[in-house]
Protein backbone atom coordinates (compact mmCIF):
# COMPACT_ATOMS: atom_id res chain seq x y z
CA UNK A 1 0.00 0.00 0.00
CA UNK A 2 1.31 3.45 -0.89
CA UNK A 3 2.25 6.15 1.56
CA UNK A 4 1.00 9.69 2.13
CA UNK A 5 3.89 11.92 3.18
CA UNK A 6 3.70 15.56 4.24
CA UNK A 7 6.97 17.49 4.28
CA UNK A 8 7.11 20.38 6.70
CA UNK A 9 10.71 21.38 6.09
CA UNK A 10 11.70 23.02 2.85
CA UNK A 11 10.84 26.17 0.97
CA UNK A 12 9.06 27.20 -2.23
CA UNK A 13 10.81 30.10 -3.96
CA UNK A 14 8.36 32.18 -5.99
CA UNK A 15 10.34 33.40 -8.99
CA UNK A 16 9.06 35.52 -11.85
CA UNK A 17 8.88 34.14 -15.36
CA UNK A 18 6.67 31.07 -15.10
CA UNK A 19 5.83 29.51 -18.48
CA UNK A 20 2.38 30.16 -19.91
CA UNK A 21 0.48 26.95 -20.78
CA UNK A 22 1.12 27.19 -24.52
CA UNK A 23 3.36 24.97 -26.64
CA UNK A 24 5.26 26.55 -29.53
CA UNK A 25 7.06 24.70 -32.29
CA UNK A 26 10.57 25.56 -33.41
CA UNK A 27 12.73 24.61 -36.36
CA UNK A 28 15.03 21.70 -35.75
CA UNK A 29 18.52 23.01 -34.89
CA UNK A 30 21.24 22.48 -37.49
CA UNK A 31 23.78 20.93 -35.12
CA UNK A 32 23.31 18.54 -32.19
CA UNK A 33 25.93 17.48 -29.65
CA UNK A 34 26.10 14.54 -27.26
CA UNK A 35 28.47 15.07 -24.32
CA UNK A 36 29.81 12.33 -22.01
CA UNK A 37 29.71 14.84 -19.15
CA UNK A 38 25.90 14.77 -19.34
CA UNK A 39 25.99 11.18 -18.05
CA UNK A 40 27.15 10.87 -14.45
CA UNK A 41 29.18 7.75 -13.77
CA UNK A 42 30.32 7.25 -17.37
CA UNK A 43 33.71 5.65 -16.73
CA UNK A 44 35.61 6.15 -19.96
CA UNK A 45 33.81 6.74 -23.27
CA UNK A 46 35.07 4.94 -26.35
CA UNK A 47 34.11 6.54 -29.67
CA UNK A 48 32.38 4.29 -32.20
CA UNK A 49 32.07 6.69 -35.16
CA UNK A 50 34.34 8.81 -37.34
CA UNK A 51 33.97 12.29 -38.78
CA UNK A 52 32.01 12.01 -42.01
CA UNK A 53 29.93 9.01 -40.92
CA UNK A 54 26.21 9.12 -41.62
CA UNK A 55 24.06 8.24 -38.63
CA UNK A 56 20.39 7.76 -37.81
CA UNK A 57 18.60 8.46 -34.54
CA UNK A 58 19.62 5.49 -32.42
CA UNK A 59 23.05 4.90 -34.02
CA UNK A 60 25.71 4.31 -31.31
CA UNK A 61 28.19 7.20 -31.02
CA UNK A 62 30.27 6.03 -28.06
CA UNK A 63 30.12 3.44 -25.32
CA UNK A 64 31.19 3.01 -21.73
CA UNK A 65 34.53 1.18 -21.55
CA UNK A 66 33.56 -0.29 -18.16
CA UNK A 67 30.16 -1.58 -19.32
CA UNK A 68 30.68 -2.09 -23.04
CA UNK A 69 27.02 -2.85 -23.74
CA UNK A 70 26.00 0.60 -22.49
CA UNK A 71 26.01 2.78 -25.60
CA UNK A 72 25.07 6.40 -26.16
CA UNK A 73 23.29 7.04 -29.41
CA UNK A 74 22.58 9.80 -31.90
CA UNK A 75 19.44 11.84 -31.12
CA UNK A 76 18.82 12.71 -34.80
CA UNK A 77 19.89 11.59 -38.25
CA UNK A 78 22.67 13.35 -40.10
CA UNK A 79 26.45 13.48 -40.48
CA UNK A 80 29.11 13.39 -37.77
CA UNK A 81 30.95 16.67 -38.34
CA UNK A 82 33.20 16.87 -35.28
CA UNK A 83 34.57 14.69 -32.52
CA UNK A 84 35.77 17.28 -30.04
CA UNK A 85 38.49 16.32 -27.56
CA UNK A 86 40.18 18.11 -24.69
CA UNK A 87 43.34 17.52 -22.68
CA UNK A 88 44.82 14.02 -22.94
CA UNK A 89 42.34 13.35 -25.75
CA UNK A 90 39.42 13.39 -23.34
CA UNK A 91 36.18 13.15 -25.33
CA UNK A 92 34.18 16.36 -24.89
CA UNK A 93 31.39 15.92 -27.42
CA UNK A 94 30.28 14.36 -30.67
CA UNK A 95 28.62 16.87 -33.00
CA UNK A 96 26.07 15.92 -35.66
CA UNK A 97 24.92 18.07 -38.58
CA UNK A 98 21.23 17.17 -38.76
CA UNK A 99 19.73 16.31 -42.15
CA UNK A 100 16.24 17.04 -40.77
CA UNK A 101 14.83 13.88 -42.34
CA UNK A 102 14.15 12.20 -38.96
CA UNK A 103 15.47 8.78 -39.98
CA UNK A 104 15.59 6.21 -37.18
CA UNK A 105 17.34 2.93 -36.54
CA UNK A 106 14.56 0.35 -36.53
CA UNK A 107 14.31 -1.73 -33.38
CA UNK A 108 11.90 -4.57 -32.74
CA UNK A 109 8.34 -3.36 -32.35
CA UNK A 110 5.79 -4.96 -29.99
CA UNK A 111 2.09 -4.59 -29.38
CA UNK A 112 0.98 -3.58 -25.88
CA UNK A 113 -0.36 -7.10 -25.35
CA UNK A 114 2.99 -8.68 -26.23
CA UNK A 115 5.01 -6.77 -23.62
CA UNK A 116 4.19 -9.27 -20.87
CA UNK A 117 5.87 -12.07 -22.83
CA UNK A 118 9.20 -10.26 -23.21
CA UNK A 119 11.97 -11.63 -20.99
CA UNK A 120 14.24 -9.43 -18.92
CA UNK A 121 17.14 -10.36 -21.20
CA UNK A 122 15.25 -9.33 -24.34
CA UNK A 123 14.12 -6.07 -22.78
CA UNK A 124 17.62 -5.29 -21.52
CA UNK A 125 19.19 -5.99 -24.91
CA UNK A 126 16.89 -3.53 -26.68
CA UNK A 127 17.29 -0.85 -24.00
CA UNK A 128 21.07 -1.12 -24.20
CA UNK A 129 21.29 -1.22 -28.00
CA UNK A 130 19.08 1.86 -28.40
CA UNK A 131 20.79 4.05 -25.81
CA UNK A 132 17.58 4.34 -23.76
CA UNK A 133 19.29 2.50 -20.89
CA UNK A 134 21.03 5.75 -19.92
CA UNK A 135 17.72 6.99 -18.45
CA UNK A 136 18.06 4.49 -15.59
CA UNK A 137 19.94 5.94 -12.62
CA UNK A 138 21.28 3.79 -9.81
CA UNK A 139 21.38 4.84 -6.17
CA UNK A 140 23.41 5.31 -4.12
CA UNK A 141 25.74 7.62 -6.05
CA UNK A 142 23.33 8.61 -8.85
CA UNK A 143 25.15 6.89 -11.72
CA UNK A 144 23.90 5.06 -14.82
CA UNK A 145 22.41 1.75 -13.72
CA UNK A 146 24.65 -1.33 -13.81
CA UNK A 147 23.01 -3.87 -16.18
CA UNK A 148 24.32 -6.69 -13.99
CA UNK A 149 22.50 -5.48 -10.86
CA UNK A 150 18.93 -6.00 -9.68
CA UNK A 151 17.39 -3.07 -7.77
CA UNK A 152 15.18 -3.61 -4.76
CA UNK A 153 12.70 -1.10 -6.23
CA UNK A 154 12.35 1.51 -8.99
CA UNK A 155 11.21 5.06 -8.20
CA UNK A 156 9.53 7.57 -10.52
CA UNK A 157 8.86 11.13 -9.35
CA UNK A 158 5.78 12.22 -11.30
CA UNK A 159 6.02 15.89 -10.36
CA UNK A 160 8.69 18.56 -10.04
CA UNK A 161 8.79 20.95 -7.09
CA UNK A 162 11.70 23.12 -8.28
CA UNK A 163 11.07 26.84 -8.86
CA UNK A 164 9.53 27.46 -12.31
CA UNK A 165 9.30 23.71 -12.89
CA UNK A 166 7.32 22.55 -15.94
CA UNK A 167 3.77 21.28 -15.61
CA UNK A 168 3.95 17.52 -16.16
CA UNK A 169 0.23 17.40 -16.92
CA UNK A 170 0.91 19.61 -19.95
CA UNK A 171 4.17 18.25 -21.31
CA UNK A 172 3.17 14.59 -20.99
CA UNK A 173 -0.44 14.95 -22.11
CA UNK A 174 -1.44 12.13 -24.45
CA UNK A 175 1.52 9.93 -23.49
CA UNK A 176 -0.40 7.62 -21.13
CA UNK A 177 -0.09 4.49 -23.28
CA UNK A 178 3.67 4.94 -23.59
CA UNK A 179 4.05 5.54 -19.86
CA UNK A 180 2.17 2.30 -19.16
CA UNK A 181 4.29 0.40 -21.68
CA UNK A 182 7.44 1.77 -20.06
CA UNK A 183 6.22 0.64 -16.64
CA UNK A 184 5.47 -2.83 -18.02
CA UNK A 185 9.08 -3.11 -19.22
CA UNK A 186 10.57 -1.74 -15.98
CA UNK A 187 8.70 -4.38 -13.95
CA UNK A 188 10.97 -7.00 -15.51
CA UNK A 189 14.01 -5.58 -13.73
CA UNK A 190 12.93 -5.77 -10.08
CA UNK A 191 11.07 -8.12 -7.79
CA UNK A 192 10.11 -5.08 -5.73
CA UNK A 193 7.71 -2.24 -6.41
CA UNK A 194 7.58 0.38 -9.13
CA UNK A 195 6.89 3.49 -7.05
CA UNK A 196 5.10 6.34 -8.83
CA UNK A 197 5.19 9.39 -6.58
CA UNK A 198 2.48 12.00 -7.09
CA UNK A 199 1.72 15.44 -5.73
CA UNK A 200 -0.78 14.85 -2.94
CA UNK A 201 -2.82 18.04 -3.31
CA UNK A 202 -3.72 17.64 -7.02
CA UNK A 203 -5.12 14.87 -9.19
CA UNK A 204 -2.89 13.59 -11.98
CA UNK A 205 -4.74 12.70 -15.17
CA UNK A 206 -1.57 11.38 -16.80
CA UNK A 207 -0.05 9.03 -14.24
CA UNK A 208 -2.83 8.06 -11.82
CA UNK A 209 -4.25 5.48 -14.22
CA UNK A 210 -1.04 3.46 -14.46
CA UNK A 211 -1.37 -0.22 -13.59
CA UNK A 212 1.10 -2.44 -11.78
CA UNK A 213 2.62 0.36 -9.72
CA UNK A 214 2.48 1.58 -6.14
CA UNK A 215 1.33 5.17 -5.78
CA UNK A 216 2.74 7.43 -3.08
CA UNK A 217 1.55 10.98 -2.38
CA UNK A 218 3.68 13.91 -1.27
CA UNK A 219 2.59 17.33 -0.07
CA UNK A 220 4.64 20.21 1.23
CA UNK A 221 7.28 22.57 -0.12
CA UNK A 222 10.31 21.84 -2.27
CA UNK A 223 12.14 19.39 -2.22
CA UNK A 224 9.01 17.22 -2.03
CA UNK A 225 9.37 16.43 -5.75
CA UNK A 226 12.99 15.26 -5.52
CA UNK A 227 13.24 11.52 -5.92
CA UNK A 228 16.01 11.17 -3.33
CA UNK A 229 13.80 12.73 -0.67
CA UNK A 230 10.96 10.48 -1.75
CA UNK A 231 13.10 7.35 -1.45
CA UNK A 232 14.08 8.40 2.07
CA UNK A 233 10.44 8.52 3.14
CA UNK A 234 9.17 5.48 1.21
CA UNK A 235 11.89 2.83 1.34
CA UNK A 236 15.34 4.04 2.42
CA UNK A 237 18.37 2.37 0.86
CA UNK A 238 20.21 0.31 3.44
CA UNK A 239 23.79 -0.90 3.32
CA UNK A 240 24.31 -3.30 0.44
CA UNK A 241 21.07 -2.33 -1.31
CA UNK A 242 20.53 -0.45 -4.54
CA UNK A 243 17.53 1.23 -6.13
CA UNK A 244 16.95 2.65 -9.57
CA UNK A 245 15.24 5.91 -10.48
CA UNK A 246 13.92 7.20 -13.78
CA UNK A 247 11.99 10.33 -14.72
CA UNK A 248 8.65 10.21 -16.58
CA UNK A 249 10.30 11.27 -19.84
CA UNK A 250 12.57 8.23 -19.63
CA UNK A 251 9.65 5.90 -18.91
CA UNK A 252 7.77 7.27 -21.92
CA UNK A 253 10.88 6.94 -24.09
CA UNK A 254 11.06 3.25 -23.11
CA UNK A 255 7.41 2.85 -24.06
CA UNK A 256 7.96 4.42 -27.49
CA UNK A 257 11.00 2.22 -28.07
CA UNK A 258 8.99 -0.97 -27.61
CA UNK A 259 5.66 0.11 -29.11
CA UNK A 260 7.02 2.12 -32.06
CA UNK A 261 10.45 0.53 -32.46
CA UNK A 262 12.35 3.84 -32.49
CA UNK A 263 14.62 5.93 -30.29
CA UNK A 264 12.46 9.05 -29.95
CA UNK A 265 14.27 12.08 -28.52
CA UNK A 266 11.51 14.63 -29.06
CA UNK A 267 10.42 16.41 -25.92
CA UNK A 268 8.67 19.50 -24.61
CA UNK A 269 10.69 21.91 -22.48
CA UNK A 270 9.86 25.12 -20.64
CA UNK A 271 11.79 28.31 -21.35
CA UNK A 272 11.37 30.33 -18.16
CA UNK A 273 12.82 33.14 -16.09
CA UNK A 274 12.38 36.84 -15.47
CA UNK A 275 14.61 37.77 -18.43
CA UNK A 276 12.61 35.72 -20.93
CA UNK A 277 10.26 37.95 -22.94
CA UNK A 278 7.70 35.22 -23.58
CA UNK A 279 8.06 32.30 -21.14
CA UNK A 280 6.35 29.26 -22.62
CA UNK A 281 6.82 25.65 -23.68
CA UNK A 282 8.64 24.50 -26.81
CA UNK A 283 8.80 21.21 -28.63
CA UNK A 284 12.41 20.26 -29.32
CA UNK A 285 14.86 17.34 -29.31
CA UNK A 286 17.58 16.08 -27.00
CA UNK A 287 21.09 17.25 -27.87
State what each model feature region is.
Residues 1-48, 215-218:
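N-terminal, Lys/Arg-enriched amphipathic/low-complexity engagement segments
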Amino acid sequence: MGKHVRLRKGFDINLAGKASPTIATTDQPDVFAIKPTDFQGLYLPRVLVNVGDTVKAGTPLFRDKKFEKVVFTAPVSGEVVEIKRGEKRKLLEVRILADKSFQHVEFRKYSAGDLASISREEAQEQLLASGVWANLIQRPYGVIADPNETPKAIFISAFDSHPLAPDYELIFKGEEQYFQAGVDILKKFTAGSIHVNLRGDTQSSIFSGAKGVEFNYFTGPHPSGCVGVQIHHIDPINRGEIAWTINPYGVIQIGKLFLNGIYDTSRIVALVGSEVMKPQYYKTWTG
